[in-house]
Amino acid sequence: MAKQKFERTKPHVNVGTIGHVDHGKTTLTAAITKVLALQGAAQFVSYDQIDNAPEERARGITIAIRHVEYQTAKRHYAHVDCPGHADYIKNMITGAAQMDGAILVVSAPDGPMPQTREHVLLARQVQVPAMVVFLNKVDMMDDEELLELVELELRELLSNHGFPGDEIPIIRGSALAALSSASTDINAPEYQCILDLMNAVDEYIPTPVREVDKPFLMPIEDVFGIKGRGTVVTGRIERGKVKMGDTVEIVGMSHEAPKKTVVTGVEMFQKTLDEGIAGDNVGVLLRGIERTEVERGQVLAAPGSIKPHAKFKANVYVLKKEEGGRHTPFFPGYRPQFYIRTTDVTGAISLPAGVEMVMPGDNIEMLVELIVPVAIEEGLRFAIREGGRTVGAGVVSAIVD
């Protein structure tokens, strides 16, 4: 059966839900698809479908990143429901890196919690350009003054992390009330908060300027073998465009030279695409490449446009204890994990002459040597993590090798 073709009629924007565990991110994601489905602009995706890995449902926390698709009158959206639990922040880093804008979900009765702060900080580090807030579970609070206090606290938190806290839209509502409503009338009062939220997302999150004219690059998130067709790699196109017949290179995560291959097909949401462009989440079919020859963390790129490097200089901000960082300094030879695009790689740190240690809160230029070369270039941002928490954020200032 021929696949349906994906029609590009509206601007495409990548958004995602972030926030503390159990504040309602997954419920809200399901509620958005439900309400927009009433307008024929989405397929309803249930809470259980989003939260669908067996080890998750027992604890009711989301681990995997789930993509859903929906439309408003203005735009086509791909929405990721990001993991909320601190243990799964690793996915948050790779997930938040995919957002043109975030929906921060905060439970009104609880207010901002540690993971709320950590996610806002991460959103800042991975440069999520804009954020709107959904103040959830407001039906459990009847005190208007308390609600206003929670809003004030949220605006202050956002401002402290470099977001324009005074102007960010905060939409109040109940995701559960919308999700559990039996009404098929789009004008039912319990659906209004979802419509208001989508309106805020439409208006406040800017349509991203896509880097379409630059050389093609796509960080690889996943690899699948498809019987009789070959190997498919999936990811979000960072820049440029790709179509059937293009020659591409698989770069990084190896000490060997990049492998060349030819694209034999491009798909988005199970529909074939004439060409994938920057910002699209796509699957790319590769000719003559075995499933074992490609892995998450590599990039697919226009030949010669990016090279793998293991040594680079970087400007790094080391988080303070209050920001969830280290409590103690670190020294030359420190070996944390570097989160670069879709991968984490161990690297050793050298400090500038005369610098003997780095304190939490310092901003420092350091030399990093990764244990395996990765596709990097000047200006690339990354996070530094150890023991399950972010300890620094950095940007590549110069390639050394």
UniProtKB/Swiss-Prot annotation:
Residues 19-26 are annotated as: G1. Pfam families: GTP_EFTU, GTP_EFTU_D2, GTP_EFTU_D3. Residues 136-139 are annotated as: G4. It is found in: Cytoplasm. InterPro entries: EF-Tu_GTP-bd, EF-Tu_GTPase, EFTu-like_2, EFTU_2, G_TR_CS, P-loop_NTPase, Small_GTP-bd, T_Tr_GTP-bd_dom. Residues 174-176 are annotated as: G5. One of its GO terms (molecular function) is GTP binding. Keywords: Cytoplasm, Elongation factor, GTP-binding, Hydrolase, Magnesium, Metal-binding, Nucleotide-binding, Protein biosynthesis. Residues 81-84 are annotated as: G3. Its EC number is 3.6.5.3. Mg(2+) binds at residue 26. GTP binds at residues 19-26, 81-85, 136-139. One of its GO terms (cellular component) is cytosol. Residues 60-64 are annotated as: G2. It catalyses: GTP + H2O = GDP + phosphate + H(+). Residues 10-209 form the tr-type G domain. It comes from the Bacteria. PANTHER family: ELONGATION FACTOR TU, MITOCHONDRIAL, ELONGATION FACTOR TU-RELATED. Belongs to the TRAFAC class translation factor GTPase superfamily. Classic translation factor GTPase family. EF-Tu/EF-1A subfamily. Monomer. This is Elongation factor Tu 2.
